[in-house]
């Protein structure tokens, strides 16, 4: 007991005690954080809702069609991810131009019940790295407009972990709700 402060001091001096940040699962009813094993203990496959939504790029008159399996995290959306090595298509739909992963185009258009569209061009996901977009709820969430002005907020990233075989091949990332998203 009386030696605990000394142990902490030595650990800090030897650089084995550090301070950092990470996302931790939290149980509101227990009012405590949960370990990875506690979170995984009750794991079972369930049907989750997914959501497609549009975000407009700020430097082009085009919309990214983004997919998420966690719609409740949209309010804390900070980035949109592309796979740098995969192909994405610019698609004319009515009076708008959408960007969708090429592999998922036909399946997505069937799911969205869109029959009248035209592919305009194809580009690699790496071409979208670092572009700013406008969050769809920008005027509806307190403080979001201020955060959106930050250089590294509401930007597109190109990362190999993005799965182009699901959704639209463009995913939303919410560092406030996912450890992997936070680590980016």
Where do the language-model regions lie?
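NTP-handling and nucleic-acid-processing catalytic cores
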Residues: 1-184
